[in-house]
Amino acid sequence: MNITDVRIRRVDNKNPGSKLLAYVTVTFDDCLVLHNIRVIRGQKGVFIVMPNRRTKVGEYKDIVHPINQSFREILQSAIFKEYVKENPSSLELEIG
């Protein structure tokens, strides 16, 4: 499965404590779209969070997620490459 498009929606937070940097939409093989991947700045660097929902008991469950580390790295790399391309001032992006 090839990543054929990555679209970044940067979040301009007025709250200085906010860790959310962007929402991402990824297209696979020009036939499947995955919305609402989040780019987050954490204590150990920047990482992606897959789309999830909150259960009745307050836990968060992924709606979709990579099942192996190799694909997660491919996906994360494509997202970060596009993020830096669209936000050249973010070259200090530290991957967590």
From Swiss-Prot:
- The highest taxon in the source lineage is Bacteria
Sorted UniProt keywords: Cell cycle, Cell division, Septation
- Among its keywords, does the record have ATP-binding? no
| InterPro entries in UniProt | SpoVG (IPR007170), SpoVG_sf (IPR036751)
Pfam families hit by this protein: SpoVG
Q: Which GO terms describe its biological process?
A: division septum assembly; sporulation resulting in formation of a cellular spore
Function of the protein: Could be involved in septation.
* NCBIfam families documented for this protein: PRK13259.1
**What family classification does the UniProt entry report for this protein?**
Belongs to the SpoVG family.
Family annotation (PANTHER family): SEPTATION PROTEIN SPOVG-RELATED
The protein depicted here goes by the name Putative septation protein SpoVG
Provide the species name.
Answer: Borrelia hermsii (strain HS1 / DAH)
Q: Report which gene this protein is encoded by.
A: spoVG
